[in-house]
Amino acid sequence: MPATFPTPSAPRSPKRPARRRSTPILLLLLLLASSSAFSHAAPLTGTPLNDGYHAMYNLDFAAAHNHFQQWMTAHPDDCLGSASDAAAYIFTEFDLLGVLDIELFADDNRFTSRKRPDIDPALRQGFQSRIAQSEHLADVAIQRNPNDANAYYCKAVTSGMQADWASLIDRHEYGAFRFSELASKYAKQALAISPTLYDANLAVGIENYMLSLKAAPIRWILGMTGAGTNKAEGVRLLKLTAEQGHYLAPFARLMLAVGELRDGRTQQGKAILIGLSRSSPRTPSTSARSRDSTRQYRHKRQ
C-alpha cells in the first residue's frame, strides 16, 4: 500500500513587526529569474513546475504552491514536485524572518544580531511534510532504479533545504553541517549518473563556499571529515549552476552576488545586478505588484 502524506495546512500569517528591506530580494530574484545574461538558462515558464519556481522567486507563494500542486497531481511519483513545494514553504519563512534581505545576509554581524520573530508552526509543519513526502518518493524511485539521477537530485535538494532551515532559522550549526554533507553526497551521486544535471552543482558549490568562510582551524577539521571547504571551487560550481542550471540558476546567481558583497567588492556585486536589470524593463512595476500580492497572501493564510 503506497504511503500517503497529509496536505500541509495553510500557514497562518504571524503578527510580526514591519521591517524595511534595504535591497528587496523580490526585486533581485525577478531580475535573476528572467535575465538573459546567462545565455544557457531556459526561462522558468511553460510548465507548472517552471511557473511555480518563477512565482516563488517573485515571492508569490500562493501561486507557487498552486503550480507545484498541479505538478504533484499530474506527476504523483515525481519527488521533485513535493521538494519544490517544500522550497515554497522555506522561502516564505525566509521572507518573514528577513533572511532574504541581501544586504543583511551579506553582513554576518547584522544578520546574527537581527531581531528574530517567532517561527510560524504551520510553515514548519508544511515544510517538514513535503520534505518527508519527497524523500519517500525518492527512496522508492531509487529502489526501482538505482541509477535514477532525479531521485538523488531530489534528496540533495531536500537535504540542502534542511541545512538551510537548521542554520538560518533554527541556528543549529551542527545539524546544518550534517544536512549539508548529505546534500553534497547526493548531488555528487546525481552528477555521476547525469553530468548535465547542472542544478545539482549548487549543493556542492554552497558547501564549499559557505564552509570556506569558517575560521582556519574549523576548515581544517571539516576538511578531515570530507567536507568541501574550497572557496574557489565553491564559486566555480555556483557559476556553473548560474550559467547552465535551470530551476536553481536564479538562486546560484543570487549567491554569486552575495559573495561579491561579502568579499567587499560592492561595485562588482552591484555591476552584476545592474547588468541583470537591463534585461528586465518590467521589474519596477512587477516588484510593486509582488509586494501587494505577498501581503494579500499572508492575509489569506490567516
Language-model features: locations:
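N-terminal secretory signal peptides that target proteins for export/translocation
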Residues: 1-20
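Bacterial N-terminal signal peptides
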Residues: 24-36
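Boundary at the C-terminal end of the N-terminal hydrophobic targeting segment
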Residues: 37-43
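Short coil/linker segments at helix-helix boundaries
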Residues: 43-68, 77, 88-147, 154-196, ...
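Canonical tetratricopeptide repeat
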Residues: 48, 82, 152, 201, ...
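Solenoid-like repeat scaffolds
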Residues: 71-75, 224-228, 242-245, 275-281
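A cross-kingdom marker for long, charged
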Residues: 258-301
